[in-house]
Design a protein with these regions (language model features):
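A short acidic Gly-Thr/Ser loop motif
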Residues: 8-13, 65, 104-109, 127-130
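Adenine-nucleotide phosphate-binding core of ATP-dependent small-molecule kinases
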Residues: 174-219
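Short glycine-rich, Thr/Ser-proximal phosphate-binding strand/loop in the N-terminal lobe
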Residues: 3-41, 45, 120
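Glycine-rich phosphate-binding loop plus the immediately following alpha-helix
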Residues: 93, 118-173
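Short glycine-aspartate micro-motif
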Residues: 2-8, 57-61, 100-105, 125
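Conserved phosphate-binding catalytic cores of ATP/NTP-utilizing and phosphoryl-transfer enzymes
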Residues: 70-104, 109-119
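Short beta-strand-loop/turn "lid" adjacent to the catalytic site in phosphate-handling enzymes
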Residues: 28-32, 43, 48-84, 117-122
């Protein structure tokens, strides 16, 4: 059965997925120093692990910041470039049964796309994402490896790092519960444990991306 392959060539990671007819095959992510090397490495590995032949591929659809470096057909298969905002919005919309959604792309940085039945609109973005987590962790925790940062963060307690409304008031304020963040890292000090700091970094980035997404939904 003909296969269509989608590849997102990001700044640090290349993501790949395929559809065999209406059936979606398992996605894969590959890291590499070179975006072009990452593309071809991911493509070949994906075919191998899914028992696909090159001639099975009827189309390769590429997007992401690294797609600009691809100037010819991938392995001589029909290759098409797709706008990243369109790809993200369409993919997010596909995964939900809602008629109107805000799709948040959390990558190295993050951006927001509004999608309805009749419209797709890029709403903007923020400079927070995986790059922030890895960068701050490299400076503070001496590791930028996300596979080390995430397990460490799960052992931590963000309540020991963030200042919350409950730390400032005995009763909840109008529209603000006591567990709402008043200040990310507002309680951190030189004695804070690495696992708590890791939890604070991850929480700060994800919380603020989601808050920005909520604000974007009101535009």
């Amino acid at each position: 059965m003909p296969v269509k392959i989608g590849i997102d060539i990001g700044s640090s990671t290349t993501k790949i997925v395929a559809f065999e007819g209406e059936h979606m095959l398992p996605p894969m992510a590959v890291k590499a120093d070179s975006q072009v090397a990452s593309l071809y490495g991911a493509f070949g590995r994906y075919l191998y692990e899914n028992n696909l032949q090159l001639l099975d591929v009827e189309g390769v659809y590429i997007t992401g910041v690294g797609s600009k470096y691809v100037e010819k057909a991938v392995y001589d298969r029909p290759t098409y470039k797709v706008d990243e905002f369109v790809a993200t919005g369409t993919g997010g919309y596909y995964l939900t049964d809602k008629k109107e959604v805000i799709v948040i792309s959390m990558g190295t940085g993050s951006f927001f796309v509004k999608v309805t039945e009749n419209e797709m609109k890029h709403l903007g973005g923020v400079g927070l994402g995986g790059g922030t987590i890895c960068g701050l962790s490299s400076i503070i925790l001496n590791t930028g490896d996300i596979h080390e940062i995430v397990p460490l963060s799960r052992k931590g307690d963000v309540a020991k790092i963030d200042l919350r409304i409950g730390d400032l008031a005995k009763e909840k304020l109008p529209g603000l519960n006591l567990d709402v963040t008043a200040s990310n890292f507002g309680k951190a000090d030189a004695q804070s444990k690495p696992e708590d700091i890791a939890a604070g970094i991850v929480h700060m980035v994800i919380e603020n991306i989601c808050q920005a997404g909520i604000l974007a939904s009101r535009i």
